[in-house]
Every structure is written in C-alpha cells, then in structure tokens.
Amino acid sequence: MFSASIERAQNEAPFPIRQGVFVAVAGPSGGGKDSVMAYARERLGNLAGEIVFARRIITRPFAPGGEEHDTRDVPTFEREEAAGAFALSWRANGLCYALPAALDEEMRSGGVVVANVSRAIIPALGERYAHIFPVIVTAPRGVLAERLSRRGRETRDEVLSRLARSEAGELDVPGALVIDNSGPLEQAGERFLEALRKAAAWSDVCDMV
C-alpha cells in the first residue's frame, strides 16, 4: 500500500515527466551534430511517427545552410523565458538557446524527442524528463578546427575558445553514447540511427510501466 501511494504521487507530480525518452545530443562545435541528426532523420522509416526533432529557439538570425531554428531578439527571448514558454533555456557562446515547452506534451504522449543541447543542461533535463539518452557527437581537434574555420561563423578567438572547451573535458557525460564523426557521415549517421531505434524501444517499455 505504501509503495503504491508513492508511485501514485510520483505519477501525479508534474515533473519529472515519466513517459517518453529524450535523446540529448551534445558535443563540441564542429563535431557535426546537425549533419548526423539530419542523416538519421531522413532514414527513420516506420519510426518517423514516433520521433520528434525539436526546433530550437536561438538569439541568432537564420543563415542559409545552417540549422533551422526559430529566431528571437534578446528582449523577446527573455520575456518568453519569464512567461514559461520554454521547457529549458541556456546561454552559450554569447547566445541564448531554448527548447519550447510544447515538448512536454510530446514526452507525455510517450514519444521520443531529439534535441541538440548543451552538455551543461543535461542534469537539468533529467529533472524535467525521467528518461534521458545522452549522445555525444565529436571528432579530433584537427577536424573540429578545420570545420569551424570552413564554416566562417566564428572569429579566430571564438574558434580557439570552442576548441579549448572540448579539450577541457567539458563534454564528458556519464553513460553517454559517444559517436566519432571524423570519418564518412554514413558511419556516424548509422550509429545515431541505431541509437534512435533503441530510444524508441525504450520509450515503448516506459509506457508499460
């Protein structure tokens, strides 16, 4: 009776949401997270209806060929943040980032949500969602430096700062699946696609508990 009461109280609490699986994709700038995610997204097959790729809100203008995201200026971002419009928000590299609060309903429906996030917010994700599957997409320093220089979005000092963060062990996440994306995209993409299949299977089990 006592354990049943605890379980009922847990299920009635708003957070952490105990349905669904959140696939938290992190890694150093230049690691190719967006490319790996796009590769898998195009090949979901019959899992397409179960997996949602979150669209981030960022205080950065949209650039052709870059990540598709919703843009806000800083004052608007901060107003929406204060109003509870975001499931989670964070600051990094001089920008503000957020995930929309609508993802809570996707999780409660028992689906799989995939999002590009900062490693630093993964503990906070665990407070909001009970089932987190962290994935780190990375590459050696030389590959990161080449990619960052090629995309031309950061200054030299910003590139060096991002490389220093990856070397400082900032991307170490206990229990994470680490994907090396220094070779052909297909190799990393297939590993990530397999991770999504496992996340979908895990979500099915979560829904039965």
From Swiss-Prot:
Record-level GO BP terms: 5-phosphoribose 1-diphosphate biosynthetic process; organic phosphonate metabolic process
UniProt keyword list: ATP-binding, Nucleotide-binding, Transferase
Entry EC number(s): 2.7.4.23
Annotated pathway: Metabolic intermediate biosynthesis; 5-phospho-alpha-D-ribose 1-diphosphate biosynthesis; 5-phospho-alpha-D-ribose 1-diphosphate from D-ribose 5-phosphate (route II): step 3/3
GO molecular function: ATP binding; ribose 1,5-bisphosphate phosphokinase activity
Residues given in the record as ATP binding sites: G27, P28, S29, G30, G31, G32, K33, D34
Catalysed reactions, semicolon-separated: alpha-D-ribose 1,5-bisphosphate + ATP = 5-phospho-alpha-D-ribose 1-diphosphate + ADP
Matching InterPro entries: P-loop_NTPase, PhnN
Function: Catalyzes the phosphorylation of ribose 1,5-bisphosphate to 5-phospho-D-ribosyl alpha-1-diphosphate (PRPP).
Family: Belongs to the ribose 1,5-bisphosphokinase family.
This protein's name: Ribose 1,5-bisphosphate phosphokinase PhnN
